[in-house]
Amino acid sequence: MLVGAHESIAGGVANAVDRQLENGGNCGQIFTHSPQVWQDPSIDDTDAEAFRDRSQMHDIGPWVIHSSYLVNLCTPKDDLRAKSIDSMQQEVDAAAQLSIPYVNVHLGAHTGAGKQQGLDNAISALDELTIPDSVTVLLESDAGSGTKLGNKFDHLAYVLEESTHELEVCLDTAHVFAAGYDLSTPAAVNTTIKEFDTTVGVDNLACVHLNDSKHACGTNKDEHAHIGEGKIGESGMEAFINHSAIDPIPLVLETPNENGKGFAWNIDRVQNLAENPA
């Protein structure tokens, strides 16, 4: 199976590969810079080559670049829209430089413009990007707090259908659960995946952010928990991981580092649940 974690690039992007190895992962995700500021990736060619070489040497991949948290594709504000498009262009270019196939992005919030206008804003912003042939932009499912979009499967389906680009989806289990799609039992997992397939299509699913949730289903609260120890729980996580539609998809953990448990513990947990289904 493909399972890994979101790794730091501190000291150079190639160090993310070493950190992934230490945690026992074989795929993963990075930020190219602090996600809390507007900043260029600024990855030099030597470091990029080292990242590519180490990833190939250790057979780690696919990798995903997660875009800045400041990006808001749904915004009605011209200045924020321009910054968001510029930031995304830099991310897809960095992905090509690093031979990373995916750039993940949240649609953002419509901040009062309304759902339809927000989705249309996101589509037109994405359509302004020049995406390298080797890179695919992934729309991440959202927990849906405030006016954020992407919390409903039909939001994702609409953007996929209307954009001029060939986009795909990253499903975050904690976000989906928070948005009201139950994953806490095997039956609920089957229902949710069936609804996703009917609305979006599992053939459009390129990556999963595998996270448990500290909050109940439908609360729209985005706070991640250790695998099997949150409100989704062991039964739901086990059923999700072992579902035939999910089995070939890269699973990227964004679980907490707390209570003596970090990425290594959570990766091991996922592997055990996959190897020893109930």
UniProtKB/Swiss-Prot annotation:
Cofactor binding comment, as recorded: Binds 3 Zn(2+) ions.
UniProt cross-references to InterPro entries, sorted A to Z: AP_endonuc_2, AP_endonuc_F2_Zn_BS, Xyl_isomerase-like_sf, Xyl_isomerase-like_TIM-brl
Calcium recorded as keyword: no
Binding site for Zn(2+) 3: 175, 222, 224
EC number of the protein: 3.1.21.2
Biological function: Endonuclease IV plays a role in DNA repair. It cleaves phosphodiester bonds at apurinic or apyrimidinic (AP) sites, generating a 3'-hydroxyl group and a 5'-terminal sugar phosphate.
Family affiliation: Belongs to the AP endonuclease 2 family.
PANTHER family for this protein: APURINIC-APYRIMIDINIC ENDONUCLEASE, ENDONUCLEASE IV ENDODEOXYRIBONUCLEASE IV
Protein name: Probable endonuclease 4
